[in-house]
Amino acid sequence: MTPVESLWIVLVVLFGIVGIVRGFLKELGVTLVLIVLLFGLTRLDANLKKLLDMATSKIQAVGQLYGNPTVWLIFYAVIIIGVMYVAYQGYVLKYPGDEPKGVQGTLLGLMVGLINGYLFIGALWYYIEKYKQPLQALGIIQGEYSALAQKLVKILPPDLLNPFLPFLVVFMIILLVVK
């Protein structure tokens, strides 16, 4: 079976290639959407569970879903994939300015694409790691992670960027507004 870190690296590199094709300024719009998504999910995580706890205390059937890791994994995966789909297929937030030409434009597109891949695939991996019990039961995740994968899990976006997300959101919005 392919190590999870190999799949992660391949997918992040694929996003880098997409970044080259789409261009630096369009990819920055996706970066803004991803940072706002991560900000929302990290703030929503604790509050959503408290809210559901209050709401489901009287409804037994929903209360059984509340503690189910499969439901939480599907919930977060659908939100992350749905937001990414809209970010790439829906209204495109394109930062103002002209696309840099030549090697500079290619490298900027690659860099921002790699960042977007890290944010997207890293966020998915974070929630898969957090709620991995259903995937282990299905045999999708088997055994322990390699040493590299264990190091990568510690630097996934929700954990690594959590203290900086409010500042990153403001910074990215300022970049969008200032021409």
Range-by-range predicted roles:
Residues M1-K179:
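Alpha-helical transmembrane segments and their juxtamembrane interface "caps"
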